[in-house]
Amino acid sequence: MKILITGTAGFIGSHLAKKLIKQGHYVIGVDSINDYYSVSLKEDRLKSIGKENFTFNKVKLENYDDLSKVFVDEQPEVVVNLAAQAGVRYSIENPRTYIDSNIVGFMNILECSRHFNIQNLIYASSSSVYGANTSKPFSTSDNIDHPLSLYAATKKSNELMAHTYSHLYNLPTTGLRFFTVYGPWGRPDMALFKFTKAIVNDQAIDVYNHGNMMRDFTYVDDIVEAISRLVKKPASPNKEWSGADPDPGSSYAPYKVYNIGNNSPVRLMEFVEAIENKLGKEARKNYMDLQPGDVPETYANVDDLFRDIDFKPETTIQDGVNKFVDWYLEYYKK
């Protein structure tokens, strides 16, 4: 199968490309390789994918003409849209970047998918869409009308836009609400990377909300395993869906949203301890208030994921952290 992945030079995208190629698929990579963080890290991720059954296109999603040319030239059957401007905190200071990448860019993905008869569009949403919701665990049937950051608002917008195209054009769309993904080749702006780097270099780490936080950390291999199964399972209409009692996570149209999380929140200080255990070194800690746009806890209900693709992420936090630290020390030769 020919599968187009946007964000192929990114953290999840590079892992997914390797997974799908190993399964025998042909992967068409798309990425702008912007400088939001280390360009060399992105280029090294691309190198790690190799060249067999893989082609790469340096394209910005905001440029419809360039993007549509990739669809014309490569004729993909499935699209996995992982390209986005990431980061809750960054969105507060750089809002326009999020509109360009996450709204305009996704609109172009939808248009290309519609015009080039894509059989299955899978796209990254985010656990941040749950915003002010405090019911736990977070369920795709929950209301998500109160986002706490522009990043979260753009991700909810993506889900609404996808539903519109599923309704109007019968385009199968599947949105994936990722919960705090971590692992080798991770982004430098994410907690695991920042904490590991700081501890290795004898620098203090910033611990938000004075350590009173919980995250449903999800190992990257579990994320890509779920996506690889969903590649073969396009969204289909929910025959039991009712407009009188609408389920936000499905539809009468070929539209579905899943949580992909570990279904097992970990306390932030336990996460820090896992890094300390692996490095054999205690962190110096700066305890700070909760940051704007952040939430104190995330917790994924993954019942429908297990029901539909017989998969539930299960990598333990210590195992996942160990694999990241091993990669970090090797990559930076510490």
UniProtKB/Swiss-Prot annotation:
<comment type="pathway">
    <text>Capsule biogenesis; capsule polysaccharide biosynthesis.</text>
</comment>
<dbReference type="Pfam" id="PF01370">
    <property type="entry name" value="Epimerase"/>
</dbReference>
<protein>
    <recommendedName>
        <fullName>Protein CapI</fullName>
        <ecNumber>4.-.-.-</ecNumber>
    </recommendedName>
</protein>
<keyword id="KW-0972">Capsule biogenesis/degradation</keyword>
<dbReference type="GO" id="GO:0045227">
    <property type="term" value="P:capsule polysaccharide biosynthetic process"/>
</dbReference>
<dbReference type="InterPro" id="IPR036291">
    <property type="entry name" value="NAD(P)-bd_dom_sf"/>
</dbReference>
<dbReference type="InterPro" id="IPR001509">
    <property type="entry name" value="Epimerase_deHydtase"/>
</dbReference>
<comment type="similarity">
    <text>Belongs to the NAD(P)-dependent epimerase/dehydratase family.</text>
</comment>
<keyword id="KW-0456">Lyase</keyword>
<feature type="active site" description="Proton acceptor">
    <location>
        <position position="151"/>
    </location>
</feature>
<keyword id="KW-0270">Exopolysaccharide synthesis</keyword>
<dbReference type="GO" id="GO:0016829">
    <property type="term" value="F:lyase activity"/>
</dbReference>
<feature type="binding site">
    <location>
        <position position="126"/>
    </location>
    <ligand>
        <name>substrate</name>
    </ligand>
</feature>
<comment type="function">
    <text>Required for the biosynthesis of type 1 capsular polysaccharide.</text>
</comment>
<keyword id="KW-0520">NAD</keyword>
